[in-house]
Amino acid sequence: MSRIGNKIITMPAGVELKNDNNVVTVKGPKGELTREFNKNIEIKVEGTEITVSRPNDSKEMKTIHGTTRALLNNMVQGVSEGFKKELEMKGVGYRAQLQGNKLVLSVGKSHQDEVEAPEGITFTVATPTTIAVEGISKELVGQTAAYIRSLRSPEPYKGKGIRYVGEYVRLKEGKTGK
């Protein structure tokens, strides 16, 4: 099993962690995140280092231990650096534009799709075919980017649709003629 839970998390300068009965609040230059963790897991802060420990070596505790450490690390990284997912659109007439905090997508449907930015998420449209989703919560950034991609996933014959930057879409061969 992975030993990720035993790794020590180092807090960068300007990041502050408060643990109140396993409800952890992490404050940093980009914002503040709060999350409740399992009562059996112990979270200690010593200077700029955070250690996560478990009471026993049962299979359940080992999994919760690793997950807790990974979530805490993502919180610390989010409030100090933030997270960003970039999407690109391929297809004739496919484009995106911002209207306030709404993302308006034209993706070959009879209507335009509008995506409201959840709290803590910002959209950036550098070119009409590239979208950047940014925020401090890795979970929320990933969910929002996945939702935008799901509005028109890449199809397997021409590759038209919304995809992550750098995502490889395997293309199928078309029908062979007579």
Swiss-Prot record:
UniProt-listed InterPro entries: Ribosomal_uL6-like (IPR000702), Ribosomal_uL6-like_a/b-dom_sf (IPR036789), Ribosomal_uL6_a/b-dom (IPR020040), Ribosomal_uL6_bac-type (IPR019906), Ribosomal_uL6_CS (IPR002358)
One GO cellular component term noted in the UniProt record for this chain: cytosolic large ribosomal subunit
GO biological process: cytoplasmic translation
Annotated keywords: Ribonucleoprotein, Ribosomal protein, RNA-binding, rRNA-binding
MF terms (GO), sorted A to Z: rRNA binding; structural constituent of ribosome
Assembly mode: Part of the 50S ribosomal subunit.
Family the UniProt entry places it in: Belongs to the universal ribosomal protein uL6 family.
Function comment: This protein binds to the 23S rRNA, and is important in its secondary structure. It is located near the subunit interface in the base of the L7/L12 stalk, and near the tRNA binding site of the peptidyltransferase center.
Name used for this protein in its record: Large ribosomal subunit protein uL6
Species annotation: Streptococcus uberis (strain ATCC BAA-854 / 0140J)
